[in-house]
Amino acid sequence: MTRIVLFLLTNLAVMLIFSLILFLTGIQSNTIYGLLIMSGLFGFSGSILSLILSKWIALRSVNGEIITHPRNEVESWLINTVRQQSIQKGIIMPQIAVYHATDINAFATGARRNSALIAVSTGLLENMTHHEAEAVIAHEISHIANGDMITMTLVQGVVNTFVIFISRFLSQIISNVMSSNRNENNTEEKNSFVYFLVSTFLELIFGILASIITMWFSRHREFYADASSAKMVGREKMIAALNRLKTSHEPQESDSMIAFCINGKSKSFLKLFASHPSLENRIEALYNQEYM
């Protein structure tokens, strides 16, 4: 219920901002041109802002601590491994963070491939061998080197744009049809209310359907990162790491972060909405040398 209320309030706030910007710029939202500009502007703005703030958001969400100077042998090994793999992939060494969590997990984020962050859980450092952890780090380094965070932002921005555009285009048609069949006072106010309700409903429905596209891309990102890691450190190490993930506790990271983690929630109610392939499918893909 809380999420629905927040969604409605957010949608109302976005509509008010839409109206203000369109009024100040002189763009008419009831034209295809104006609606497309509006949709693109707000479709990409949220994704781009999230990307820019991704490191800050990620660290706060897991309460991570950036490691600048190693405090023990494990952290020394971690820093050296990240440094060597960064050189291997031709990127500037990302910042390294450790966060307390019992699950075996790690993620990479950042707005640019040469200004990124890799975070690993204490559960990973405590429960994985060096060979397994090396493969996980290579997986995250591959995400950075491949520019997956930026690509994901572009995909999400395009999807958001189409969701907003189609929803509001259809809402305008529906509200116009309904108003043409009425001969009442305050038609304009009622028309705006109908437009708001219809657009909110359509954005919710199309947003759910659009997430199928972004989750499909997210799953394929994982396959390619697994394959890239296998090329870097060896297929056996990557397979061993994935097998180790089977013994992990359920991921504790927030829903907003889980898509960036190596150990995601693949057991979704519908596989179409899962951010990660199953560990079995990922292992099978490595055995069959797919995506390599």
From Swiss-Prot:
Transmembrane segments: 4-24, 32-52, 147-167, 193-213
CDD domains xrefs: M48B_HtpX_like
Subcellular location: Cell membrane
Cofactor binding notes: Binds 1 zinc ion per subunit.
EC identifiers of the protein: 3.4.24.-
GO aspect biological process, one term: proteolysis
Cellular component, GO, one term: plasma membrane
Alphabetized InterPro entries for the sequence: HtpX_protease (IPR050083), Pept_M48_protease_HtpX (IPR022919), Peptidase_M48 (IPR001915)
Zinc found in the keyword field: yes
Catalytic machinery residues: 140
Main subcellular location: membrane
GO molecular function, a single term: metalloendopeptidase activity
UniProt-annotated binding residues for Zn(2+): 139, 143, 222
Keyword terms of this UniProt record: Cell membrane, Hydrolase, Membrane, Metal-binding, Metalloprotease, Protease, Stress response, Transmembrane, Transmembrane helix, Zinc
Keyword Membrane: yes
Cofactor dependence: Zn(2+)
Membrane association type: Multi-pass membrane protein
NCBIfam families (alphabetical): PRK05457.1
Family designation: Belongs to the peptidase M48B family.
Protein name, per record: Protease HtpX
Taxon lineage: Bacteria, Pseudomonadati, Pseudomonadota, Gammaproteobacteria, Enterobacterales
